[in-house]
Amino acid sequence: ETAFQGKLKGTLRWLTLPDRVDLKGMIHGTLVFSLEEDWTQAGENSIPAGSLVALDPHDPQAKPEILFIPDSGKVLENAAVTRNTIIVTYLEHVQGRAMVLHASPDAKNRWHQVVLPLPDMSSVHIVDTDQSSDAAFLKVESFLSPPQLWLVGTTQPGLEQIRQIKPLFNAAELAVVQLQARSPDGTEISYFLVLPST
């Protein structure tokens, strides 16, 4: 179970959360967490495992707000909180993606989503975030590109590659393509092929 201690005169209040959640942090007094199991509340639609959810822990009657929900093509990987944003990494058709959810300090439960223009055919991982600012660091790498460190800044949001490991081979004449295979039960399976570009 999960307990919350806020402005409650030193007392704990138990939150009615599922048994299996992954707490990501607090932003503007709102608790952010991902679900590791389906969450069914009385009189409400079930929220599937793999969703990212925000909840006001001060209000016992507050309803959860879904920030990210998985579907047939998208899977949540991770999320982290800065001062005013939530950094979310996810897979979209097996390609790494990242987006920023901006929280307005003057409009409760209002989020603005910005998908970051990172390289395609890559994996994307959160390295670190700063809760005293809106800065975050992402690691991006692919079959042909060595690990890169990207800074997600504080405006719009700013995005800048600030470091890259020296390449171990010349990738100029190579290319990566994504293909689909179908299993006997009809499941679509993505795979990548590295081949000469000419």
Predicted features, each with a name:
Residues 1-35, 66, 70, 77-81, ...:
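Non-catalytic accessory segments flanking enzyme active sites
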Residues 33-47:
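Short, conserved, GDST-rich strand-edge loop motifs in beta-rich repeat architectures
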Residues 43-44, 59-61, 106-110, 186:
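Short, solvent-exposed loop/turn segments that connect beta-strands within catalytic domains
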Residues 55, 60-68, 73-75:
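C-terminal, non-catalytic "cap/extension" segments appended to globular domains
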